[in-house]
């Protein structure tokens, strides 16, 4: 898809992605825009509390090519997306709209709630956390959580 927008072949697109990705990563580090990758460091990150510790948690999935190995197929298959996927958990500061935390990649069949618990995210004191229905039952200690109610009708 990236190559189609610029009239590049798959080989050219692959070359440029691998050539420019390290530059992008270095730039993000230089301007301090990389998210935490360690759940225990979230509470001490200054950007977490910027504008108040109003945070939102979300699970994000991206499609994969179907694995050939039947065992890997079962691990990667997401019933929610009806496809083979990988998943990450994101934590966003609702005030600054910055991604504060990006979890390790997990298999698509793992539920958002379980992936968040396994990430062992440590939240700052008096934080508020907005979550969707995928995190029902996820109640981190010392955090005020809110979940939207389903509309009736």
Predicted regions located by residue number:
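Short, well-ordered secondary-structure "scaffold" segments embedded in the functional core
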Residues: 1-153
């Amino acid at each position: 898809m990236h190559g189609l927008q610029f009239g590049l072949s798959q080989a050219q697109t692959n070359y440029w992605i691998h050539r420019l990705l390290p530059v992008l990563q270095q730039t993000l580090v230089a301007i301090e825009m990389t998210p935490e990758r360690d759940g225990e460091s979230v509470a001490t990150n200054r950007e977490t509390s910027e504008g108040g510790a109003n945070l939102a948690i979300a699970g994000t999935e991206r499609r994969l090519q179907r694995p050939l190995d039947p065992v890997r197929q079962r691990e990667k298959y997401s019933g929610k997306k009806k496809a083979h996927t990988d998943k990450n958990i994101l934590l966003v500061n609702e005030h600054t709209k910055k991604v504060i935390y990006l979890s390790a990649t997990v298999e698509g069949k793992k539920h958002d709630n379980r992936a968040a618990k396994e990430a062992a995210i440590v939240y700052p004191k008096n934080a508020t956390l907005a979550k969707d229905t995928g995190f029902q039952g996820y109640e981190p200690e010392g955090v005020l959580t809110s979940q939207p109610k389903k509309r009736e009708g």
